[in-house]
UniProtKB/Swiss-Prot annotation:
GO biological process: methylation
Gene name of the record: prmA
Catalysed reactions, semicolon-separated: L-lysyl-[protein] + 3 S-adenosyl-L-methionine = N(6),N(6),N(6)-trimethyl-L-lysyl-[protein] + 3 S-adenosyl-L-homocysteine + 3 H(+)
An example Gene Ontology CC term for this record: cytoplasm
Domain of life: Bacteria
Localization, UniProt: Cytoplasm
Keyword field contains Methyltransferase: yes
EC code(s) of this entry: 2.1.1.-
Function: Methylates ribosomal protein L11.
Molecular function (Gene Ontology), one example: protein-lysine N-methyltransferase activity
Organism: Clostridium botulinum (strain Alaska E43 / Type E3)
UniProt cross-references to InterPro entries, sorted A to Z: Ribosomal_L11_MeTrfase_PrmA, Ribosomal_PrmA_MeTrfase, SAM-dependent_MTases_sf
Family note: Belongs to the methyltransferase superfamily. PrmA family.
Protein's recorded name: Ribosomal protein L11 methyltransferase
One Pfam family in the UniProt entry: PrmA
Length: 313
């Protein structure tokens, strides 16, 4: 590799940050960094309000976000850029605003990569009680705070996105000490880890992506939890038994595909917490939930995104 890394960037909208980050993790990037000026501007000032520390992004406030991914210098740059452009176009075809949608790339020295990508991640309060911190940062919990430790360069899900925060808030509200929780499309494992830290009897994370599965397992290890398991595969194919709560932070189209399986994986009266739903897709998801025997209890909003909590009748 000769000490060289590839940086691929997409200049996009705040709405498209999550799906574009997902593209890069699907391409097995070694890390993803997000520059979102609006995220900085909408948070209360304080020592834990900064999800990333590059103040220069404020120069672009409200204009655009930038999602950066890092790949080995030995990877096929032309192929990575081509696939990224194709996937960004697919996101646009789903009705998600991609903003400028410009894909750029550069080669950078290894020492620049090693120092630069980590500066974007600092300890962050995702609820009043739960703090997410990267593994290399020190943090002393206050009062009854729960700290989730992550290596955010390994798989999607760092806790900084609106959809993740809303899912964690819902888990905080509904997880009980005898709860069994399934996290579908677990990515980094952050939601399963949150459920386990909140006292769930058992949390199971499942993902189709073997890279995500390995990442989630490593993050579970960082948090020293024994009430959590990470599995590779489809929900009903790999999980036995039923859950009290199923959580899925994905996109509306996939939620609709999963809903019938989720109804079979839940105990009667169980909850389906789901996010990754833009405003234009809320009616589609709630209709599918109703069709599959769910009663919608909550529709929570944060920015461009929605989180739905539904109860199996």
């Amino acid at each position: 590799m000769n000490g060289v890394w590839i940086e691929v960037r997409v200049i996009t909208s705040c709405e498209a940050i999550e799906p574009i980050s997902g593209i890069f993790y699907g391409l097995n990037s070694q890390g993803v960094a997000v520059e979102d000026p609006n995220d900085l501007l909408t948070r209360d000032q304080g020592p834990l309000t900064w999800d990333f520390a590059d103040i220069n992004v404020l120069e672009h406030k409200g204009e655009f976000a930038v999602v950066k991914a890092y790949f080995s210098g030995d990877d096929d740059l032309e192929k990575i850029v081509s696939i990224t452009k194709e996937k960004v176009k697919e996101i646009q075809e789903m009705g998600i605003d991609i903003g400028k949608g410009i894909v750029e790339c550069d080669k950078i020295k290894e020492e620049d990569w090693a120092n630069n990508w980590k500066k974007y991640y600092k300890p962050s309060n995702i609820t009043d009680r739960i703090v997410v911190k990267p593994m290399w940062e020190e943090y002393l919990p206050k009062n009854e705070e729960l700290v989730i430790e992550l290596d955010p360069g390994m798989a999607f899900g760092t806790g900084t996105h609106e959809t993740t925060r809303m899912c964690v808030k819902a888990l905080e509200k509904y997880v009980e000490h005898d709860s069994t929780v399934f996290d579908v499309g677990c990515g980094s494992g952050i939601l399963a880890i949150a459920a386990a830290k909140l006292g769930a009897k058992l949390a199971l994370g499942v993902d189709l992506d073997p890279v995500a599965v390995e990442s989630a397992k490593e993050n579970v290890g960082l948090n020293d939890l024994d009430n959590i398991e990470i599995l590779e595969g489809n929900l009903l194919d790999v999980i036995d038994g039923k859950a009290d709560i199923v959580v899925a932070n994905i996109i509306a189209e996939i939620i609709c595909i999963l809903t019938d399986d989720v109804s079979k994986a839940l105990n009667k009266g169980g909850l389906f917490i789901t996010s990754g739903i833009i405003h234009e897709r809320v009616d589609m998801v709630t209709s599918k939930l109703d069709e599959c025997g769910f009663e919608v209890m909550e529709v929570n909003k944060d920015g461009e995104w929605n989180c739905i909590v539904a109860k199996l009748k």
